[in-house]
């Protein structure tokens, strides 16, 4: 099994990353680590979009511009780790999504105009933490879930969150341990599937 770990955290002492490491360290698999803060993934602009469209129209996917999309499409499981910022996630993750969402690699349009997901992965795990309360799961996690299921063809989406971490009087360690318990259930599911 090959896991793609997409890290959209930027703080070295990230609590989101702590939960992710807890999970990742307990799933035996080949792991590709992608720290988005170390990558130079920029928002799509007209020049890049036109270049990419020329390549995809010609079905020329050998250009290095597509390596993020190929890694994503070929992973067996994807773990996305992002703090809850501004009702969703950091811009780093949105830039990455624009880079991977390539027609012909991650998805395709059928003759009827419907979307057909091309990803090998059957599982995506989304991990987030918030200093306050997560107002709605729809904006961050919900967006990732819809994109993964409807566009990428990934069936099983798991969600681990720890919220209220910066609220005065919060029992931070207990909140994080509860998130790790959710991770334990996912680990058990993976171990059962792979035995």
Tell me the role of every PLM-derived stretch.
Residues 110-152:
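Short, glycine-/small-residue-rich phosphate/pyrophosphate-handling segment
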Residues 135-136, 142-195:
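Glycine-rich phosphate/pyrophosphate-binding loop and the adjoining helix
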Residues 102-112:
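Conserved nucleotide-sugar donor-interacting segment of glycosyltransferase catalytic cores
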Residues 73, 91, 119, 152-155:
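Structured loop/turn residues at beta-strand edges in well-structured enzyme cores
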Residues 34, 127, 160:
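Hydrophobic residues at beta-strand termini and immediately following loops
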Residues 9-13, 131-135, 165-167:
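Short histidine/acidic/glycine/proline-rich micro-motifs that form metal-
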Residues 1-98, 102, 181-195:
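N-terminal beta1-alpha1-beta2 submodule of the flavodoxin-like/Rossmannoid cofactor-binding fold
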């Amino acid at each position: 099994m090959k896991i793609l770990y997409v890290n959209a955290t930027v703080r070295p002492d990230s609590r989101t990353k702590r939960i992710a490491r807890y999970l990742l360290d307990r799933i035996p698999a080949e792991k590709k680590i992608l720290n988005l803060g170390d990558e130079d993934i920029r928002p799509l602009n007209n020049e890049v979009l036109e270049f990419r469209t020329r390549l995809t129209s010609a079905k020329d996917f050998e250009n290095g511009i597509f390596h993020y999309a190929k890694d994503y499409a070929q992973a067996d499981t994807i773990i996305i780790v992002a703090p809850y910022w501004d009702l969703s996630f950091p811009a780093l993750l949105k830039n990455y999504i624009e880079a991977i969402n390539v027609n012909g690699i991650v998805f395709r349009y059928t003759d009827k105009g419907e979307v057909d997901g091309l990803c090998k992965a059957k599982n995506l795990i989304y991990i987030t933490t918030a200093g306050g309360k997560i107002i709605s799961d729809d904006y961050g996690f919900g967006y990732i879930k819809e994109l993964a299921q409807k566009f990428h063809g990934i069936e099983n989406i798991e969600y681990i969150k720890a919220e209220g971490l910066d609220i005065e009087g919060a029992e931070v360690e207990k909140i994080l341990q509860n998130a790790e318990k959710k991770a334990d259930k996912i680990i058990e599911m993976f171990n059962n599937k792979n035995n």
